[in-house]
Amino acid sequence: MTPQTPLASGRDADVFALDGDRVLRRNRDGRSPAAEAAVMAHVTGHGFPAPRVHAVDGADLVMDRLHGPTLLGAMLTGGVDAAEAGRVTAGLQDRLHALPAPGGGALLHLDLHPDNIVMTAAGPVLIDWTNAREGEADLDVAMTALILAQVSLAGVFPPPVPALAAAGLDGFLAHTGGDPVRLLDGAVGLRADDPNLAPQEEAVLAGAADRVRERAAAVRPAD
């Protein structure tokens, strides 16, 4: 039986604790998470740190329960600085892009940022694979940079989150193995089509893209 009170809630799903080892995530719109679960099973099968899938039933996904703060939470408490957060974020993304993909391209997460990384005792684990697909790795790099820039500019997140996002953007740009600018326009288009964006986030998309270009030129002058 599903608990009545969510353990956590996102923009389009709720997460319920089933026991100490498992959680159930339910999509509010009723869509099946089967495709997402297949990607998660693929990456964990190749040793990548993502929650292990136990079952898919309708709109419900049962998976491992993770214990620890998100990377953003660790930044907020001062346990991780922006440079280290950038290294962790870029490192996970580089590892993901190095995995074999069924279609021969790269596996993209397309929502990889510090609030989707859980800092467990065994190491960082990447969650929320809803947007995952195959494609060009630089699109994923551009999306992460764009999200961080948006958070720093949108004015919908309480202090000190915008400042941490700005510093985290520089940390990410310093450590990523990809090109954050080459496919940035494509990332802007995908982000603009996201129905879960707040109006304030949509309003700063162009400015966020400009911020990525500016910071990439400053942090990665040799590119």
Features from the language model and the residues they span:
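ATP-binding glycine-rich loop module of kinase domains
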Residues: 2-37, 41
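Conserved catalytic core of Hanks-type protein kinase domains
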Residues: 43, 65, 147
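Active-site Asp-x-Gly
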Residues: 123-161
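Conserved beta3 strand of the protein kinase N-lobe
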Residues: 51-56
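Active-site acidic catalytic loop and adjacent metal/ATP-binding pocket
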Residues: 14-18, 98-139
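Conserved kinase catalytic-core helix
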Residues: 41-42, 46-49, 72-115, 124
